[in-house]
Regions:
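Cytoplasm-facing regions of membrane-associated proteins and arrestin-like adaptors
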Residues: 113-230
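Short proline/glycine- and polar residue-rich coil/turn motifs
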Residues: 105-113
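Membrane-cytosol interface motif
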Residues: 59-77
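Hydrophobic beta-strand positions in extracellular immunoglobulin-like domains
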Residues: 61, 77-78, 119, 134
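Short, acidic/polar linear motifs in exposed loop/turn regions
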Residues: 80-84, 123
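Short acidic, flexible loop segments centered on an aromatic residue
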Residues: 50, 60, 83-99, 209
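Extracellular/lumenal glycan-associated context and N-glycosylation machinery
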Residues: 1-58
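Exposed, interaction-prone extracellular/peripheral surfaces
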Residues: 3, 109, 198-382
Length: 382
């Protein structure tokens, strides 16, 4: 990178030019000499940034995924890849919205310097660490040259989770589960026998009954449906009284989602402008780390419509929001969920007492802490 002047350097350059020009114009030799001296200092500052160091830089995080509050540390290793001794330099390490300035001492050829650093994890977030940059400049801060040595690395600070073993809110069990009243000729829940009709799959002929009655008889089944759980989170800031409600809501979505994936059920998670990744629990939690509210985000009033549009086959729908929407708002949102879908609306209000109200296929629950979630779900399925 080409050396450049800092804001102080540009000010010094302006002062040097003005001093020389005014000194010569007014015949003020002292002012002209001061301007010339300042110009010499600027030239020397630029010369101190000339030359390219050869570094091998390794930015390593002990773990790319941590839970809120867990310790996250990284190691920065800088090796002098040249044969000659390097000059002292300054290393800039951006960490999220902040960063650190590390002093790099003079290194002999092939020598290494290590720095350990800690990353704050008090809040759910995706923390971007890096890129690592070396900075060479003069002691007065007039000029500097910055070189980039690494790509940025993401640290995912996952939301808190609570175990939901035994508390799944599903209504239709996956494959081996609850049968419907729809009849099928090729499913897993046996219903009855009927006369063979041309075109029936001969694999389902019941030969013992056929031999006894003298006519072909085939098996008929009850249709079983594959459970799909749809989770939808409000991202409208007007639905949340404070940040704690949002964090509780995200942790609720994450806990239910992880449990659903562990049970190998189909899952759709709607939060923000798109769907969250649900191929594995870690990927789901990675996306949960980045969830935020934004002006124009989908509020609880639009969650039911969004499920109907993006997950119409869902057998279970869970809508999660803050404490601001009224019970009437929650019921209105649930009315847009496809008919026949078991619907649960959860209101997150830190400090509130748990409550569950069920009417038909709709349940509305309130939880005050994440530890309340298993009890709320048990009341719903009970």
């Amino acid at each position: 990178m080409v050396p450049r002047l800092s804001p102080i350097g540009w000010g010094a350059l302006a002062a040097a030019v003005a001093g020389v020009a005014l000194g010569r114009g007014l015949g003020w030799l002292e002012l002209a000499a001061a301007g010339a001296a300042l110009a010499v200092v600027l030239v020397l500052a630029l010369l101190m940034t000339v030359g390219r160091e050869r570094y091998e830089v390794d930015l390593d995080l002990a773990d790319r995924r941590v839970r809120v509050g867990e310790r996250a540390v990284g190691r920065l290793t800088v090796r002098n890849a040249s044969r000659r001794r390097s000059l002292p330099a300054r290393i800039e390490l951006p960490v999220g919205a902040g960063g650190a300035d590390l002093a790099l001492p003079s290194l002999a050829g092939g020598a290494e310097h290590d720095d350990l650093f800690a990353i704050p994890t008090s809040h759910r977030a995706v923390v971007v660490v890096g890129p690592v940059r070396s900075v060479r400049g003069d002691p007065l801060g007039l000029a500097r040259r910055t070189l980039r040595w690494t790509e940025p690395v993401e640290l995912f600070v996952h939301p808190e989770l609570v175990s939901l073993t035994g508390s799944s809110a599903g209504v239709l069990r996956d494959l081996e589960g609850q049968a419907t009243r729809d009849l099928s000729d090729s499913d897993l829940s046996f219903h009855a026998l009927r006369d063979y009709v041309a075109g029936d799959d001969r694999r389902y002929i019941h030969w013992r009954t056929t031999a006894r009655q003298g006519v072909l008889m085939v098996k008929q089944f009850e249709d079983t449906r594959r459970t799909q759980t749809a989770l939808a989170l409000s991202t409208d800031p007007r639905d949340f009284d404070d940040d704690d409600e949002l964090e509780l809501a995200v942790s609720t979505i994450a806990s239910i989602g992880v449990q659903t994936l562990r049970e190998q059920r189909d899952l759709v998670v709607l939060a923000g402008p798109g769907r969250l990744r649900v191929s594995t629990p870690p990927l789901l939690l990675d996306d949960c780390s980045a969830v935020s509210v934004e002006i124009g985000g989908t509020g609880v009033s639009g969650l039911g419509r969004r499920i109907a549009r993006e997950a119409p086959a869902a057998s279970v729908a869970v809508l999660v929001t803050g404490s601001v929407p009224t019970p009437a708002d929650l019921r209105a949102a649930a009315r847009h969920v496809p008919v026949g879908t078991r619907t649960l609306v959860l209101t997150c209000s830190p400090g509130a007492e748990i409550s569950v109200r069920t009417q038909g296929s709709l349940s509305i629950g309130t939880l005050g802490t994440l530890d309340d979630l298993p009890r709320v779900l048990r009341r719903v399925v009970g």
